[in-house]
Amino acid sequence: TLVGGNCGMSLAPLAGAHAPAVRSYLAPITGAFGDELCFASLADYFAAAERTPQIVNNAMLAGMGTLRALVAGFDDAPLTDGQYRELHRLVERSLADGAVGVSLGLGYAPECFYSTEGLIRALEPLRGGRLPVTVHMRQEGDGVVDALREMLTVARELRCPVEISHLKGIGRANWGRAVPEMLRLLENARAEGLDVACDVYPYSAGSTQLIHVLPPEFQKGGLDALTAALRDPGSRAAMRGRMETGSDFENITHLVGFENVVPISLHTEEYKPFEGKSLAEIADMLGKDPYDALFDLLAAERCEAGMIDFIAAEEDIEAILRAPFSVPISDATYPVEGLCHPRVYGSAARFLAHYVRERGILTLPQAVHKLTMQSADRLGLSRKGRIAVGADADLCLFSPENIRENGAYTAPRQLAAGMDAVFVAGVPEIIDGQFTGETQGRVLRAH
């Protein structure tokens, strides 16, 4: 079962005056797509999905970033009363259509423009409910602990489940420091009675839009406005000044260095050959300053580029995985061309092979529970993740010693190995590691 729409970005609904800007914003994540994938509601999206044969089950979170952008574009102004009413209408419609929760991307435009009070107001339809709010927090670098405290405030106020997405502390100065403190905060909040938990991907590198390295205030107005700013000498100088010293945003190049940021999903003839090279390498090859190389690349690509960024510490990943309230995720995006992150193909295999079999940080039963029942229950999917009378017969058969990830950052599109058989709804879709051609996947709605 795949659950999409995380980090505030979902593909539906996608209609209205601001829809073209949202489509452009999603392009580094989804690849470019046409009108045939623009739906007026999540129900319409699900209906189209059900007309398409699916290998796996699919559920969807309602992306609050998509919904806010449909209401107010990428403006940084506080929402008006009327805009909040329209946002609540869209949230309630998506939940009624079967979304298994909502997601936030507080590190991204336009959600980075919320105050804490505005965020709580935006989430009012979730108050006292059972559906979770998943959140890419406002910061994951120097301000990550304060960002977690903000979300604990939200959880206390709304009394709904809150899932901290891909918990980490970005940057060497935060490794081994921020994560232990955050795990203590989560433990204390759970003891207080808050329904808070977290997840983590089993890699030290992440992947998202390349514009995420820029100060958020320059992202107001959407990608067209940002592209224009990247071509303006005054705006470039202001961006550089903020990136050289700023700690009040997720300043990735400052935290980990240009050598640890790798652009992907490049499309122009000028920059496509540099895909897979770090920003430091690209700057050196072009004879440019790293900031100029970054700004020129983004402007040429009209900001529709992605990145792989090496940001986290293995010791922190292991500490999070050991926590009883954590689960592993892929956090994968699925670009239709070019390089992708190896987690697209190998997350579960890497978790089982590296962290369980080789590192021994969890027993196999503990690991399987996290991958199955614990994850399903968090999203209210009561017929998934268990072997029981009345449950769906979705089963994976494997020998632990044979599981392995085959992908690498330079060659990510490699299927993992060791899954002997996979049954979806009781029908074999993989036998002896080979696809059978069956397509028993279904759309899953909250119930």
Language-model region placement:
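Short acidic, glycine/serine/threonine-rich loops at helix termini
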Residues: 7-19, 69-75, 116, 145-149, ...
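Acidic, glycine-enriched loop/beta-strand segments at the rims
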Residues: 280, 305-317, 363-368, 376-413
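Active-site neighborhoods of metal-dependent hydrolases
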Residues: 46-49, 54-81, 85-108, 153-156, ...
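Hydrophobic residues within beta-strands of alpha/beta enzymes
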Residues: 2-4, 102-103, 133, 162, ...
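C-terminal cap of metal-dependent C-N hydrolases
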Residues: 232, 319-325, 330-331, 345, ...
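Divalent metal-coordination and catalytic microenvironments
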Residues: 58, 98, 136, 199, ...
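Metal-associated gating/positioning segment near the N- to mid-region
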Residues: 1-36
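Divalent metal-binding pocket/active-site signature
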Residues: 93-151
